[in-house]
Amino acid sequence: MTGYLGLGSNQGDRLATLRAARASLERHEVTVTAGSSVYETAPEGELLDQPDFLNACVQIETALAPEPLLDVCKQVERELGRVPGGPRHGPRPVDVDLLLLGELEHRSERLVLPHPDITARRFVLEPLLELDPGLTLPDGTELSGALDLVADQRVALVDTL
């Protein structure tokens, strides 16, 4: 099944960490079929006094169901130095978010698919639409239509994944 993951980092060698996350996914029943460009973005939320983030997205193929795929995402984060339980929107060596998985809609205590903030974050939309300009949510909503709503959010293209 085709899915999309968001990658982020704002501690250490951010670009190397994103590339390591991409490589690590391949060791966990996930095939990365495409990677977006890397974008630099300012922190958001209640903790703004921290370094800028680098963000990217990857397109994947996997036979994993949503919850086991989330476990893989959390395992990759731990492998790359993230300690569970840090503050929401706080600094982190790596973040691996499950954004979309096929046409699945999923809701549990641990996971909501599609990711509930997917249309509110330009640092997610830009790389996602780079991978698939016609990408839609399971309800048919075209993600390209959400870009106008987040046009005021700063993102800067910095590298490739």
Regions found by a protein language model. Name each.
Residues 29, 44-53, 64-161:
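Flexible, gly/pro- and Lys/Arg-enriched active-site loops
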Residues 7-9, 62, 129:
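Short, structured patches in soluble enzyme cores that scaffold and shape functional sites
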Residues 1-29, 36-42:
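N-terminal beta1-alpha1 ligand-phosphate binding loop
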Residues 33-36, 126:
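A short, local hydrophobic-aromatic micro-motif
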Residues 58:
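Short basic (Lys/Arg) and small-residue
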